[in-house]
Every structure is written in structure tokens, then in C-alpha cells.
A protein has these predicted regions:
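Short active-site loop at a secondary-structure junction
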Residues: 48-50, 70-129, 177-191, 251-254, ...
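Active-site helix/loop module of the DD-peptidase/beta-lactamase fold
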Residues: 83, 95-142, 191, 198, ...
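Sec-dependent signal peptide recognition
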Residues: 1-8
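Catalytic-site signature segments of enzymes, centered on catalytic residues
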Residues: 66, 77, 141-233, 250-264
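Hydrophobic (often cysteine-bearing) scaffold residues that line and stabilize catalytic clefts
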Residues: 31, 35, 80-84, 88, ...
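Non-transmembrane alpha-helical segments in soluble domains
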Residues: 36, 40, 93-96, 111, ...
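C-terminal motif of bacterial Sec signal peptides marking the signal peptidase cleavage site
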Residues: 13-15
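Catalytic loop of the DD-peptidase/beta-lactamase superfamily, centered on the K-T-G motif
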Residues: 18-67, 75-76, 204-206, 218, ...
């Protein structure tokens, strides 16, 4: 009997040992050495880019890589310019989805929510505003026809309040600049984005900062990321969050500051169907709605640029580049996203940074990820 019991015990232990062979091995981590080499070399050879940093986020594993070179550290706080656009739209979508507390439809005319008599087409929606299809003259007019765009300069200045600026933009025409009917043409950036912020404050019943904290920062656990208006003062930025100005009139399309860790949480939200940690900030449908292509001629959703697919493939890459060189992106096929921070605050060569990431760094990261898939 004892011998039989020992035999049964031996068979049981062998079975337990064999069953462990069925467990899959731990997933190998990608090797991002070549990605780091690229970023380190870039900041060493580009005189207007003395530093750079990046963070890579996996949909399920979270942060899988972080690095910094030159005069940046992994904790640097940077001004993001247009890499603010996706976060801004994320808040607008959160308001749109809060049916229990907020009367707001992002696809309804903004005249439903604004108390002023406007000069622009009454059919304009907030969706039009943040897809750059409102018909209101866009951002590039400030560079090519600055005198004609001057009546709308409040969006770039730290003085005043967001609602005061929104009223000015909504009630002041730009007669010497071309405009179109809403949802008929793509005209990037500018007044339409600041006007969307005014809509948010009116429907949300609080300042942009209060709404940002309530709907995004607190549920996502953000520590640093917030909006201000340093666009006219960016060349003096020293990385101190206390130097953020224009808190009462934050710039919607380009006023955000952040560190890597906070921005990574926003990327994770868009990878995980609107979930930030244990909190559902947006619905899966809301996240997908931001990626819907509204301007196929250029590839743009709401905040996201949509990268053309490779021949025979489908769209998988969405990005949000900024004037100072930073760029964020998500890859819905590989289930990862990332952001690279640059600080080219002269504004003369930001595209060198974001363009280099798009054409050179992203393929390197894709290769590293594909090697362990």
C-alpha cells in the first residue's frame, strides 16, 4: 500500500512538472538600442535640437522604454505646441459623452451653446472646429498675411480669458482672408481651435483647467500636464512648470506642457479604448471617432493626422506633430504608441525633428517590435 501511494505521488509530481511546459514563456522585450542610437545621434548633430527624449507605451504592458539625451532628462517638462491637439480633443470628447451632466453634442452647431451673435456660418459644429473644417481662416494666415489676421491674435497671447478671446473670435470677421462653408475644405489650426475651448467652458460650466482636472488629469493620474499660453514666450522656457503663463486663456491647439510620464498615460488611453488605469475616460466609440478621417485629401481626423497605409495595407498609424519638433503617435496594429519630445523653440525647424521621427525613428521602432512579435 505504501509503495502504491508513493507511485501515485510520483506520477502526480511528474504530471505537475510536465504541465508547466504548456505555459507560454514570458514575452521577450523589444531591443530599442537602435532607436536610442538614432535619437542620441540626432541631438548630437542637429544644432537646433540640443536635447531629445522619448517614451514607448505598449497597450497591455504599459511603458516599455524611456530614454533621454543631450540637455533633456527623462523628467524634462516641455512645451508641446500642436502635440497638444489630441489631448484637447480628448477633453472635448469626454464632455460630449457625459450625457448625465453636460448638454453637449460635438456634432451639433456651436450656436446652440454660444451666447453671442456671431459672424461665421451658423452651421459650424465643434467637430468641424477640431477637424479643421469650420471654414474659419486657419493658422497659416498669421505667417502669410499677419496684418489681416491680427484681429484674432488673442488666441496666441496670455492676457485675458478664454471666454473673452472666444467671443472676440466668434464676433470678429476677417474680411480680407478666404473662408469657406463648414465641412467643405481643410484649413489647419487657428481660431477654430480656440473657439472650441470657449464652447467647452460654456457647456462644462467651468474653466478649461477645472474641466481638464475633472475629466482627464484626475482619472488618469496626471501630475504635470496642463494647458497655458506661452506661444509668444516659448524661447524663454526653462522647463519650470511654474513658468507656464496664460492659465486663464490657455491655447487649445498648442498650449500644453507635459513630461514623458504624463503624456504616456494619454497615449495609453488611446490604445486602450478610452481607459486610463482603472477609469473609463472615453468610450471605445469615442476614441475611434477621433480617428475617423474627415479630410481624405490630407488624412485628418480630430487631432490625429492619419498616415497613408502601405500599398495593399490598411491604416494603422496616427500622429500628432508639433511646431517645436515633438510628435506623438499610436500604432493600432502593433498595439503601441510613443511620444518624442524636442524643444526647437525658435520655430524655424521643428519639422526636422518630427519629420525625422516619422521617416527614420518610427521604422526602427517598428522593426524592434516586429522582431519579438
Amino acid at each position: 500500500m505504501i509503495r502504491f501511494a508513493c507511485l501515485l505521488l510520483s506520477l502526480f509530481l511528474i504530471a505537475c512538472s510536465d504541465s508547466s511546459d504548456d505555459n507560454p514563456p514570458d514575452k521577450a522585450l523589444p531591443d530599442f538600442t537602435m532607436a536610442d542610437t538614432w535619437l542620441e545621434s540626432f541631438v548630437a548633430t542637429e544644432p537646433l535640437f540640443p536635447g531629445g527624449s522619448m517614451i514607448i507605451v505598449d497597450k497591455t504592458a504599459g511603458v516599455i522604454h524611456k530614454s533621454a539625451f543631450g540637455n533633456q532628462s527623462e523628467d524634462s517638462v516641455v512645451l508641446l505646441a500642436s502635440t497638444s491637439k489630441v489631448p484637447a480633443v480628448t477633453l472635448l470628447m469626454a464632455l460630449h459623452e457625459d450625457d448625465a451632466n453636460v448638454n453637449f453634442d460635438i456634432s451639433a452647431p456651436i450656436t446652440n451653446y454660444l451666447p453671442w451673435l456671431g459672424v461665421w456660418d451658423s452651421a459650424i459644429t465643434t467637430e468641424n472646429l477640431v477637424s479643421n473644417r469650420s471654414g474659419i481662416p486657419g493658422l497659416f494666415n498669421i505667417f502669410i498675411r499677419p496684418a489681416d489676421y491680427a484681429p484674432h491674435l488673442c488666441q496666441f497671447l496670455p492676457a485675458g480669458t478664454l471666454l473673452e478671446c472666444a467671443e472676440t473670435l466668434f464676433t470678429t470677421s476677417l474680411p480680407n482672408l478666404p473662408s469657406t462653408k463648414p465641412n467643405t475644405a481643410f484649413d489647419y489650426g487657428g481660431s477654430q481651435w480656440q473657439l472650441a475651448g470657449g464652447v467647452a467652458e460654456l457647456v462644462g460650466g467651468g474653466t478649461w483647467h477645472q474641466l481638464w482636472d475633472q475629466y482627464i488629469a484626475e482619472p488618469c493620474g496626471l501630475q504635470v500636464a496642463r494647458f497655458g499660453n506661452n506661444l509668444s514666450l516659448s524661447d524663454g522656457w526653462d522647463g519650470n512648470p511654474d513658468g507656464l503663463v496664460g492659465l486663464a486663456n490657455p491655447n487649445m491647439e498648442g498650449g500644453m506642457m507635459s513630461d514623458l510620464d504624463d503624456y504616456a498615460k494619454l497615449i495609453s488611453l488611446h490604445l486602450n479604448d478610452g481607459a486610463c488605469g482603472g477609469n473609463q475616460v472615453l468610450s471605445p466609440e469615442g476614441v475611434a471617432f477621433m480617428r475617423k478621417d474627415r479630410s481624405p485629401e490630407v488624412g485628418y481626423g480630430m487631432g490625429w493626422w492619419i498616415k497613408a497605409p502601405k500599398q495593399g495595407g490598411s491604416v494603422y498609424l496616427y500622429d500628432d506633430p508639433g511646431y517645436y519638433g515633438s510628435i506623438s503617435w499610436i500604432d493600432i496594429e502593433r498595439g503601441y504608441g510613443a511620444v518624442v519630445f524636442f524643444e526647437e523653440y525658435t520655430g524655424t525647424a521643428g519639422g526636422v525633428g518630427s519629420g525625422g521621427v516619422t521617416s527614420q525613428l518610427i521604422p526602427i521602432i517598428e522593426e524592434a517590435l516586429d522582431a519579438v512579435r
